[in-house]
């Protein structure tokens, strides 16, 4: 198969040769490897890459992936990172408009206003920048003679991949991992990896989030050596019994192994003090080319997990051969909790759930959405310090470590799928869905269901996740209904959230478990709750903290005491989106917002809505948050 640039124009092509999404677990050959600072089965490709920038597809270096290609004219770029912040293209902030507004006329393929000219919409566009990356590497000795995969944790927005001159695959969905099998093409030494990243494809219609419009390889790139016997996917499902002191844990596994290989799975569960509290094992059975099995065992005494006491247990899955030899070990921390809805009220471990939350974009004043671990931990510390107990990952999945930090800190998570098509149905503030996507368009359906699938499969084991969110401001329709159906079929005990059923009440029963609104006034919340409400109420966005804001928070908080079905909400938002740059006159570092980069179209200072500045200094509004949220700890 050869790469086809026309895939950029086709919403039905969004993954080619990409491996199925799976759990985000780590794996090791033995317990000794778990103690090492670096996993010998992993090799990072982060660092300096060769790079060329092109203004569009036609100007790209077409054969740059060939092994004998002369890349002496290429520049150098650091991965992970945004291409714009490396000095290429234009830095641009937009809220709901698309980057092509005012320049080119685009409507989503197959929408009511489509022109029939979508065949070259992005592949032949005058403006659709391309980044061509080359990385040369040798395999580390520990990884040789094994199957090799590569994982791109985040690439905006569409990527083509080659290794040693051979086409490997294609992927969209900027914010979930894209994984490919390199085994047929890789060598021990002298490998040439080539990645071509396109700023826009049909995926752009689904990624119209309120943020700076960057592109490039902005999250980690890792080679993974896969043992002969390997846990491909694991689903931990710990449950807390009604007595709140005992529980069960189910572990569903899918394992790859040589044909005829006998493999057993052993579960060991330990508490925080490293005392063993449960153990069980099964022999895996062959099914559809894989080994599968489910361990289901009682845990006699457990401590419940919640925001007040985020108690985690250490689970270890050992894969063993017929002689008992350990072939692979998978560690994972899990918590026991019970989430339920009784008489239209949500309860966690038998107590009514109250959300004192924030929306949080991933952001660094220096590196944009390519954030570091120390910035994530600083955000967690800030939330704990200011009585924030929940976060909505607006409006895309975050980096994998964030979910582990939330598990550990007891921060409840609304895990949002990477979807927003705001600009297709709202124009100049008016709702006009004639060219909305995905809506009920069959050709877009699998693309958005795949995004839901990637979100669920990657993060399903995280105790902190209480809600799955179908996305943000993408109107309603059969395609979004199909996303909800996917989550419901998983029966994982979590609730599904989506706000835009408010726009089309024909779907209110089939795309959200909660009545969710943005910026509803307190009296509007009361009107709903006083008139035979069908569902519990959440404000997925409220208290828009732009400028001198947050003065009305106390009025909303009173609703928590007045109405059991009101569960609180998520402030918009946690952190300003602004970039540190040197002032042209003083030479000092200053924060610059939308519109400060001569970017048009732009929504200007609308990028600054945080309760912390982009450098993570708390704003005065945080005092209101700390006080009122603290009343409900």
For every predicted segment, state its role.
Residues 1-111, 192, 196, 272, ...:
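Accessory carbohydrate-binding/adhesion or oligomerization-edge regions at the termini
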Residues 3-16, 20-21, 35-36, 50-54, ...:
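Accessory beta-strand-rich segments of carbohydrate-active enzymes
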Residues 37-61, 78, 83-86, 128, ...:
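Substrate-binding clefts and catalytic carboxylate motifs of secreted carbohydrate-active enzymes
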Residues 81-139, 143-151, 157-162, 169, ...:
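Active-site-adjacent substrate/metal-binding segments within catalytic domains
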Residues 143-146, 186-190, 299-314:
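Short glycine/proline/serine/threonine-rich loop/turn segments at secondary-structure transition edges
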Residues 161-163, 246-284, 293:
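Beta-strand-rich binding/interaction modules
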Residues 228-258, 624-633:
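Surface beta-strand/loop "capping" patches
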Residues 232-240, 247-250, 328, 382-385, ...:
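Active-site region of glycoside hydrolase catalytic domains
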């Amino acid at each position: 198969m050869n790469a086809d640039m026309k895939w950029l124009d086709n919403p039905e092509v969004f993954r080619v040769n990409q491996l199925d999404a799976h759990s985000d677990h780590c794996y090791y050959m033995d317990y000794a490897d778990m103690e090492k600072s670096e996993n010998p089965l992993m090799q990072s490709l982060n660092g300096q890459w060769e790079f060329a920038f092109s203004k569009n597809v036609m100007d790209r270096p077409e054969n740059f992936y060939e092994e004998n290609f002369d890349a002496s004219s290429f520049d150098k770029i650091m991965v992970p990172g945004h291409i714009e912040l490396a000095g290429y293209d234009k830095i641009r902030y937009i809220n709901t408009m698309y980057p092509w507004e005012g320049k080119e006329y685009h409507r989503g393929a197959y929408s009511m206003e489509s022109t029939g000219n979508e065949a070259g919409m992005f592949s032949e566009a005058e403006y659709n920048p391309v980044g061509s990356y080359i990385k040369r590497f040798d395999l580390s000795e520990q990884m040789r003679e094994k199957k090799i995969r590569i994982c791109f944790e985040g690439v905006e927005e569409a990527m083509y991949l080659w290794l040693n001159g051979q086409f490997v695959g294609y992927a969209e969905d900027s914010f979930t991992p894209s994984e490919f099998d390199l085994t047929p093409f890789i060598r021990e030494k002298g490998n040439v990896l080539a990645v071509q990243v396109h700023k826009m494809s049909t995926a752009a219609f689904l990624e119209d989030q309120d943020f700076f419009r960057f592109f490039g390889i902005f999250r980690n790139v890792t080679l993974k050596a896969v043992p002969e016997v390997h846990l491909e996917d694991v689903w931990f499902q710990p449950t807390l019994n009604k007595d709140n002191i005992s529980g069960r844990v189910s572990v569903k596994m899918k394992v790859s192994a040589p044909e005829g290989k006998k493999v057993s799975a052993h579960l060991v569960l330990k508490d925080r003090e490293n005392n063993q509290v449960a153990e069980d094992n099964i022999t895996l059975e062959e099914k559809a080319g894989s080994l599968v099995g489910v361990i289901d065992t009682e845990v006699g005494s457990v401590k419940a997990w919640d925001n007040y006491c985020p108690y985690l247990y250490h689970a270890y899955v050992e894969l063993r051969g017929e002689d008992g030899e350990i072939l692979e070990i998978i560690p994972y921390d899990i918590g026991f909790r019970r989430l339920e809805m009784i008489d239209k009220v949500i309860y966690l471990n038998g107590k009514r759930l109250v959300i004192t939350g924030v929306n949080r974009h991933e952001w660094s004043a220096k590196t944009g959405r390519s954030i570091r671990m120390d910035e994530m931990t600083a955000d967690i510390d800030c939330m704990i310090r200011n009585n924030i107990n929940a976060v909505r990952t607006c409006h895309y999945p975050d980096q994998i470590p964030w979910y582990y930090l939330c598990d550990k800190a007891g921060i409840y998570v609304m895990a949002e799928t990477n979807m927003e098509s705001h600009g297709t149905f709202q124009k100049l503030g008016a709702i006009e869905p004639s060219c909305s996507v995905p809506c009920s368009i069959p050709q877009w359906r699998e693309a958005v269901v795949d995004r839901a699938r990637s979100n669920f499969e990657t993060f399903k084991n995280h105790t902190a996740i209480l809600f799955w969110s179908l996305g943000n401001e993408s109107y309603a329709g059969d395609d979004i209904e199909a996303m909800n159906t996917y989550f419901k079929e998983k029966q994982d005990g979590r609730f599904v959230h989506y706000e835009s059923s408010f726009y089309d009440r024909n779907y209110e029963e089939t795309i959200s478990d909660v009545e969710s609104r943005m910026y509803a006034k307190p009296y509007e919340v009361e009107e709903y709750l006083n008139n035979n409400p069908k569902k519990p109420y959440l404000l997925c966005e409220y208290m828009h903290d732009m400028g001198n804001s947050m003065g009305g928070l106390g009025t909303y908080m009173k609703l928590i005491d007045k109405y059991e079905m009101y569960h609180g909400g998520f402030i918009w938002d946690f952190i300003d989106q602004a970039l540190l740059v040197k002032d042209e006159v003083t030479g000092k570092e200053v924060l610059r917002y939308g519109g400060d980069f001569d970017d048009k179209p732009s929504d200007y200072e609308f990028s600054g809505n945080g309760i912390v500045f982009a450098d993570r200094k708390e704003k005065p509004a945080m005092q209101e948050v700390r006080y009122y949220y603290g009343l409900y700890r």
